[in-house]
């Protein structure tokens, strides 16, 4: 978890143990490092950033207002779960050990030291058969899970959308957005309440008398949900999310999720282009995207008439209507002394005004294209003749279509190539590193909480890292940053406190306590406060000095 937090929030945490550090100072009179307490923890800086861009109040709005007795403000449940998501804790059970018993982290969530040690209430303690742990933790893991799934899907969706709005207002995104849209399956078992199901073909490892590594196609039932996302390719931030059951077709929600993305960034930014995969090949939807002034790029299916026409036209491009371009790139392979360079060629043929896309119209494939007055709408096509030195046969050539300009076919080609970023940097990363498919409970509500919180934290932590880079740039130019102003405020609140690090532990003390524990007399302060070196040792360790 620590390495994950360092990567995502660019800070460092250690185990707080005031007694151990006090004993070390008393006996050895040395320490590794010491900072004033304005060197806040990783989450404290992150929470400050959320307040600065006005996202923190949105966390308070997640309260479903269903608690009859509000012993604990709902925001505290949200903050703990947020830490679970960012800390990449795969299951709910380890949350107790990694978060709920950590006094420093729970302090940031609003719990005090007594609650961390003794729990926030006595409910269930009399019925407990096992011995009570020395540190109960601020919450029970089951309580956290039961409370967090009470957030309604509508509140979660609003939280995500408003968070993206705040990022757009903070000018995190480029002025003209080039986006990608794709879906991913959120597979579960049939035991999840509210899940959908679909009968799909899957390739599995073959058994029996078959070649090594040979795969066999079998049909299986899949259960779960499907997640739609609009992804801003430059920053790597998802700007709109939609969830439905797993059997729904890809093109069902493309217009809805695109409209939401436009709404989320409309105050300061504009979506200029959208790349989609073959699963979104629906003429009616693509026509609607075109009417919104958004350029799209999509590959055609191999058996379509438009695909065959484009390939045939690419063979006879000498007539002057087509545009052929070749790009050479040097790719380095190997490491050290074994490195070698390879010249990689890619050849494209741009075909303007392809007239055989008769499915591209307001009615889609349902339109009567045989009518005498039917006029097909032209689209521009790009045929890939050679891709990274690989020249496939004509019937295997990839064909893209776009409603955008075709001055340079590589603009279309590169734009579609960016679509792989949503697969690798969003869906694969959130599943593998953010544990997207590990909800707090095996229910529809649990899945919605996990998806929206993971996607929101993915967006906000990415923006936070970008913000830190900007703060460092301003600091290098000699300009005051909001980070520095925040540190000054912390220094005023904690000007007499120090945080002392000894190996993997740290402790927080008043400044005179650190000095006196290391056996350096502070006569005036000791007299005014009536403290001694021994009394300070006992205060933190509960023991008499050795």
Predicted regions and their residues:
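Charged, often Cys/His-bearing segments associated with DNA-binding zinc-finger transcription factors
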Residues: 1-50, 525, 531, 536-539
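An anionic, glycine-rich sequence signature occurring as long contiguous blocks
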Residues: 2-15, 102, 292-421
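Basic, short loop/linker segments at the boundary and entry of helix-turn-helix/winged-helix-like folds
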Residues: 33-82, 134
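Short, solvent-exposed helix-loop connector elements
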Residues: 62-69, 410-418, 432-449, 468-476
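Short, conserved catalytic/metal-binding motifs centered on acidic residues
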Residues: 80, 95-96, 138-144, 175-187, ...
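Active-site-proximal, Lys/Arg-enriched surface segment
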Residues: 141-228, 540-541, 545
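Electropositive, glycine- and tryptophan-enriched low-complexity nucleic-acid-binding patches
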Residues: 205-267
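A short, flexible helix-boundary coil/loop motif
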Residues: 318-361, 432, 437-438, 444, ...
């Amino acid at each position: 978890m620590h390495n994950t937090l360092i990567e995502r929030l660019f800070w460092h945490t250690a185990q707080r143990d005031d007694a151990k550090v006090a004993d070390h100072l008393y006996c050895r009179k040395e320490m590794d490092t010491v900072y004033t307490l304005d060197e806040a923890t990783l989450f404290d800086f992150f929470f400050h950033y959320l307040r600065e861009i006005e996202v923190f109040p949105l966390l308070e709005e997640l309260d479903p207002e269903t608690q009859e007795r509000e012993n604990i403000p709902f925001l505290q449940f949200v903050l703990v779960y947020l830490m679970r998501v960012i800390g990449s804790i795969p299951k709910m059970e380890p949350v107790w050990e990694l978060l709920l018993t950590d006094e420093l982290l729970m302090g940031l969530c609003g719990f005090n030291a007594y609650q961390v040690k003794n729990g926030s209430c006595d409910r269930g303690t009399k019925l407990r058969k096992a011995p009570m742990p020395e540190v109960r933790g601020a919450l029970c893991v089951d309580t956290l899970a039961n409370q967090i799934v009470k957030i309604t899907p509508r509140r979660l969706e609003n939280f995500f959308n408003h968070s993206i709005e705040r990022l757009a207002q903070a000018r995190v995104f480029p002025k003209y957005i080039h986006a990608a849209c794709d879906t991913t399956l959120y597979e579960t078992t049939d035991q999840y309440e509210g899940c959908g199901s679909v009968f799909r073909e899957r390739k599995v490892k073959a058994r029996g008398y078959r070649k090594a590594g040979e795969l066999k196609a079998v049909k299986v039932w899949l259960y779960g949900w499907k997640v739609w996302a609009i992804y801003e390719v430059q920053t790597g931030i998802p700007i709109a999310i939609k969830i439905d059951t797993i059997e729904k077709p890809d093109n069902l929600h493309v217009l809805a999720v695109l409209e939401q993305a436009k709404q989320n960034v409309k105050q300061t930014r504009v979506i200029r282009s959208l790349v989609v995969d073959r699963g979104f090949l629906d003429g009616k939807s693509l026509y609607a995207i075109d009417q919104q002034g958004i350029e799209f790029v999509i590959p055609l299916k191999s058996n379509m008439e438009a695909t065959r026409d484009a390939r045939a036209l690419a063979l006879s491009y000498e007539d002057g209507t087509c545009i052929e371009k070749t790009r050479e790139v040097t790719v380095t392979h190997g490491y050290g002394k074994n490195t070698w360079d390879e010249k990689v060629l890619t050849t494209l043929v741009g075909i303007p005004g392809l007239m055989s896309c008769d499915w591209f119209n307001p009615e889609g494939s349902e339109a009567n294209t045989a009518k005498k007055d039917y006029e097909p709408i032209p689209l521009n096509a790009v045929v890939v003749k050679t891709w990274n030195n690989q020249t496939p046969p004509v019937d295997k050539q990839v064909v893209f279509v776009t409603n955008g300009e075709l001055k340079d076919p590589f603009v279309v080609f590169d734009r579609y190539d960016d679509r792989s970023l949503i697969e690798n940097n969003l869906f694969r990363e959130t599943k593998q590193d953010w544990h997207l498919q590990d909800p707090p409970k095996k229910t529809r509500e649990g899945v919605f909480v996990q998806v929206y919180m993971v996607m929101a934290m993915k967006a906000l932590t990415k923006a936070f890292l970008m913000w830190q880079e900007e703060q460092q740039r301003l600091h290098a130019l000699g300009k005051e940053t909001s980070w520095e102003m925040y540190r000054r405020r912390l220094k005023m609140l904690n000007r007499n406190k120090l945080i002392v690090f000894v190996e993997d532990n740290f402790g927080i003390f008043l400044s005179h306590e650190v000095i006196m524990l290391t056996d350096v007399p502070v006569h005036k302060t000791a007299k005014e406060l009536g403290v001694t070196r021994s009394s300070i040792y006992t205060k933190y360790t509960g023991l008499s000095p050795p």
